[in-house]
């Protein structure tokens, strides 16, 4: 059911491994190199799948750093990534319905504290119709500010820890 999410993790990690394995660097410098690798991910409307994807990405990257590349410092093993929400899913016929789509896609990559994105550009609600106007772009910024500053989303630990649904996936 979450084939796209599994593929995104697999391709992302495989690409990073191929780059890291090809780099000719002294073993003592590998942790610093590993710590500079970053990813750009997509977030779609499948909220549970997207949340699980980022949690898996984060944990697998940490494990890869420890076990394959002997990176001891946790800070250097941190999964560094930015996310673009899936603007391909925005509709032209009823653009006002894109608002909840964008918010759900943003929540999928921000709610899980250990897998929270550090960068989240959001599309404009009417982007399916054409280039956004300045007000439309400002609206996207306001969504980010509301999520970050007017809610308690960033004040809590991983609210999905212990979830049977998350553990099963």
Describe every region a protein language model picked out.
Residues 34-38, 76-80, 104-106, 114-119, ...:
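Active-site lining segments that contact anionic ligands and/or coordinate catalytic metals
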Residues 115-169:
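Active-site or pore-adjacent capping/gating segments
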Residues 12-22, 96-114, 139-148:
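Glycine-rich and small/hydrophobic secondary-structure elements
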Residues 6-30, 34-97:
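Gly/Pro-rich turn-and-neighbor structural signature
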Residues 44-47, 86-89, 107, 114, ...:
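Short, glycine-/Ser/Thr-/acidic-enriched flexible segments
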Residues 40-42, 82-86, 102, 120-125, ...:
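Generic beta-strand/beta-sheet core signal
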Residues 91-101, 131-135, 166:
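Conserved phosphate-binding loops in nucleotide/dinucleotide-binding enzymes
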Residues 1-2:
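Short, small-residue-biased leader/transition segments that mark boundaries at the very start
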């Amino acid at each position: 059911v979450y084939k796209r999410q599994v593929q995104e993790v697999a391709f992302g990690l495989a690409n990073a491994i191929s780059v890291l394995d090809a780099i000719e660097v002294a073993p003592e410098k590998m942790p610093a190199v590993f710590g500079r690798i970053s990813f750009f991910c997509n977030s779609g409307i499948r909220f549970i799948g997207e949340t699980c994807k980022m949690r898996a990405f984060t944990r697998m990257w940490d494990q890869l750093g420890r076990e394959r590349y002997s990176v001891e410092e946790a800070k250097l093993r941190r999964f560094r990534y930015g996310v673009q929400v899936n603007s391909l899913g925005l509709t032209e016929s009823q653009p006002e319905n894109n608002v909840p789509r964008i918010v759900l896609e943003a929540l999928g990559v921000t709610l899980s504290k250990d897998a929270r994105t550090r960068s989240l550009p959001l599309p404009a609600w009417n982007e399916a119709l054409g280039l956004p106007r300045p007000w439309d772009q400002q609206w996207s910024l306001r969504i980010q500010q509301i999520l970050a500053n007017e809610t308690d989303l960033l004040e809590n630990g991983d609210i999905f820890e212990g979830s049977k649904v998350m553990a099963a996936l």
